[in-house]
Amino acid sequence: TGAAGFIGWKVSTLLLEEGYRVVGVDNLNDYYDVKVKLWRLDTLKSHENFKFYPIDIENKQALEVIFQDNHIDAIINEAARAGVRYSLENPFVYLSTNTLGVLNLLELAKDFGTRKFVQASTSSLYAGQKMPFVEELPVNTPISPYAASKKGAEAMLYSYHYLYGIDVSILRYFTVYGPAGRPDMSIFRFIKWIYQEEPIELFGDGSQSRDFTYIDDIAKGTIKALKPLGYEIINLGNNKPDKLIYAIELIETYLGKKAKINYKEFHKADMMATWADITKAKNLLEWSPTVSLEEGIKNTVEWTLKNWDWIKDVKL
């Protein structure tokens, strides 16, 4: 699900390259500019083993048709309303997609005998905990409706694992970036703004840090999580927090331009820092990240410039 989304697209791409049949689902909503989603989707449609359904995971009846038409061995649920700040403006859609949408998929997995479920979750759940974040920390105090909706999904997944034996891998992703990334996230926005010589919007002073994790690493970890694990929550992160201002400096270097910074007040629903402990991913999935922030931002800048003919028109 979320096949035209950032992570769903890359996971689908790698699975198709490995020879799997992929059934992609996406509602192509306009939370961010659909041009980016359509570009991703076009690259997937060139594969003969890719079948696409333009539907919403909130629509159980439409989902049921997919399960009737296809034998689904595993569900990788990357469909979600994303974005911490927007969840304060429209909390209802976060619950209906991120929690009730998961329930729809679980009911169909139960009814049609799909034994494996990989769920995209978030480092946002760790707000207020001590770093580096380990999976066993109690994450009972989400500071945004977005985080709360993902916590609800994790809890529902446990119930269905316990009751019906569905094998569940929950992946808590840490700040994912890279080529064809989300235009609502800082790296995409900063590259576009700096290249166009427009001022960038920076919430806070840039000293906040993120465990930036490159898209290819995230997608490979997600595919490794298809193995039978029972019920496990696993961090996928770079295990190395970097200050936001450092990411900006890297973008300046690779573009050969200086950023004009428009400082804004730090947002209450944002976290000051994220840092993943990835011991569990190493042990259970034999996964660890391979792409440094320097290399990842360089790749992202190069991809942006190569595709500038349509990216220049992407709304931020």
What residue ranges belong to the model's regions?
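Hydrophobic alpha-helix immediately C-terminal to the catalytic Tyr-X-X-X-Lys motif of short-chain
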Residues: G152, M156-Y160, F190, A247, ...
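A glycine/serine/threonine-rich, flexible loop-to-helix segment
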Residues: P132, P183-I191
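Short alpha-helical
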Residues: F6, Q61, A82, G181, ...
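Glycine-rich phosphate-binding loop at the start of an alpha helix
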Residues: R81, R85-L88, A147, D184-I187, ...
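C-terminal substrate-binding subdomain of Rossmann-fold SDR/epimerase-dehydratase oxidoreductases
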Residues: L14, Y20, I55, I194-L316
